[in-house]
């Protein structure tokens, strides 16, 4: 299948094929970032919120979304699987607001991931996960199909 590309389609195509392995959460910085290039002293990342590029040093506390997992009573579940569960519940639409009351967020998360370990997954964690999901969903980066591929890719690693 060939896709005709113009500026608008390239942007959409780029995002639809973007892996969670290129999406970063940087401690102390709001939002999520796409890893652009690695440098000798760190890397350059682009904000998914405003598109601004920043340089991040090696000493910064950075997490790849592909490396984040949620504790359950049996195992750790990769974030891609959590996003897939939210996307399934919301029919690929937005989740509730991360600004909801903690009790509302915990109840929502219990619907999505009934087996999550409530002693080790805090409301602040749920807030971040819901916020990240909504950011990615607003950018068109959330689809059950792409998350299925992400889950398969991570399982193979």
Roles of regions detected by a PLM:
Residues 8, 16, 61, 74, ...:
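Detector for Asparagine
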């Amino acid at each position: 299948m060939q896709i005709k590309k113009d500026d608008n389609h390239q942007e959409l195509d780029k995002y639809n094929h973007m892996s969670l392995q290129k999406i970063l959460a940087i401690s102390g910085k709001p939002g999520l970032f796409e890893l652009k290039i690695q440098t000798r002293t760190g890397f350059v990342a682009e904000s998914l919120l405003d598109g601004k590029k920043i340089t991040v040093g090696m000493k910064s506390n950075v997490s790849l979304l592909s490396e984040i997992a949620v504790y359950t009573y049996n195992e750790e579940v990769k974030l891609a699987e959590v996003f897939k569960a939210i996307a399934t519940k919301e029919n690929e639409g937005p989740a509730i607001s991360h600004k909801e009351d903690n009790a509302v967020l915990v109840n929502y998360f219990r619907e999505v991931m009934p087996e999550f370990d409530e002693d080790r997954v805090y409301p602040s964690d749920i807030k971040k996960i819901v916020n990240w999901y909504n950011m990615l969903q607003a950018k068109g980066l959330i689809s059950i199909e792409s998350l299925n591929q992400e889950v398969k890719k991570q399982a193979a690693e």
